[in-house]
Design a protein with these regions (language model features):
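Acidic, mature catalytic/reactive cores of soluble proteins
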Residues: 1-155
Length: 155
């Protein structure tokens, strides 16, 4: 996403980077946008504290919602507004708690944005702790801002 957000990469390279994000990090079926894949569990290399998390949990291959918001922002900067809106709705906790089975899986309040969402096979879709800076990160995504403008305009 930073290839797009920084403006430092040529458009061709930024488009390729976002194509890789779509192919490897966006998991529509489970409703998450992963921070990285594969998780650090089969390497002798030590990337630091994230290897201490179980694979698919938090920063070790789960959704880190701050970074997922940057994906949404990068898509809007590229002019992919419909896709950005789709992914934005994947970040909305309400959309993880629409049924009893979703509530049982998410295990986090539907009114609080989770800082992370797990992608571990045994815990896929479970929300982590709500961290105070996560919601403002989401709030500043363009799809959210356009929703607020439409609400104020009475649409």
């Amino acid at each position: 996403t930073w290839a797009v957000l920084s403006g430092a990469a040529p458009a061709k390279h930024a488009a390729r980077a976002m194509s890789s994000v779509r192919a490897h990090l966006v998991r529509r079926a489970s409703g998450v946008i992963l921070l990285l894949t594969p998780p650090f569990d089969k390497t002798a290399l030590d990337p630091g504290y994230i290897k201490g998390y179980i694979p698919g949990i938090r920063e070790n291959g789960g959704q880190y919602t701050h970074a997922a918001a940057w994906v949404v922002l990068a898509l809007t900067r590229q002019g992919s507004g419909d896709e950005a809106a789709e992914l934005f709705h994947m970040l909305n906790p309400i959309n993880h708690t629409r049924s009893a089975s979703q509530v049982a899986r998410y295990m986090t309040e539907p009114y609080a944005v989770a800082a992370d969402v797990y992608d571990h096979p045994e815990h896929r879709g479970r929300g982590g702790l709500p961290i105070t800076n996560t919601a403002p990160r989401i709030r500043h995504c363009p799809p959210c801002r356009s929703d607020r403008r439409e609400a104020r305009a009475g649409r």
